[in-house]
Amino acid sequence: MAFKDTFNKMISYFDTDEVNEVEEDVAASTDNVIPRSQQSVRASSHPKQEPRNNHVQQDHQARSQEQTRSQMHPKHGTSERYYQQSQPKEGHEMVDRRKRMSTSSIANRRERYQQSTCSDQTTIALKYPHKYEDAQEIVDLLIVNECVLIDFQFMLDAQARRCLDFIDGASKVLYGSLQKVGSSMYLLAPSNVSVNIEEMTIPHTTQDIGFDFDMKRR
């Protein structure tokens, strides 16, 4: 009996070892199963967070695009206000420019008219020679294309004839003309001036038939 009891104890001992090994195997398998489930849960939780991040990024991009569009293209109301504010300024500037152009054109026309009239005008100088040397001054006026009305009333007959001969010769050299217009007055004209004098009866004195001098004594 004692031997049998010892044999049964030995059998029961080995049976408990097998049970412990089985329990250890089951525990290890459960340990391996739990991390896998946790990994699957974690893996499933990450994809849920990624769409949220994508939505946030899309919102930021949309806002940034709207801001750039608003900066690039101003609102219609602001553009109309700017146009309305700039339009009166442009109108005033155009009016000022037109006024300046009109005044400048008028000034240019006046200058041109004055230049043309000055170039077309002919002056007539009235001279009262007192001596023979004054004849040279009269000829100088003829050289610059001026008409000279000569009155010999302050010269003696002999001096007047000498002065008249000198002026007549100079007028022929310069292609001018010398015409008698009064008893003691002669008109000396350049070549570009034509003189038309009507025939009139000039009273003659006993002094000379060709030269009717009515001279005064100095």
UniProtKB/Swiss-Prot annotation:
Keywords: Cell cycle, Cell division, Cytoplasm, Septation
Function: Cell division protein that is part of the divisome complex and is recruited early to the Z-ring. Probably stimulates Z-ring formation, perhaps through the cross-linking of FtsZ protofilaments. Its function overlaps with FtsA.
Pfam families referenced in this protein's UniProt entry, alphabetically: SepF (PF04472)
Bias (Polar residues): 29-43
Cellular compartments per GO CC: cytoplasm
Single Gene Ontology BP annotation: division septum assembly
Keyword Aminoacyl-tRNA synthetase in annotation: no
HAMAP family: SepF
Basic and acidic residues biased stretches: 47-63
Protein localization: Cytoplasm
Protein name: Cell division protein SepF
Subunit structure: Homodimer. Interacts with FtsZ.
Disordered: region residues: 25-115
Keyword Cytoplasm among UniProt keywords: yes
Chief location category: cytoplasm
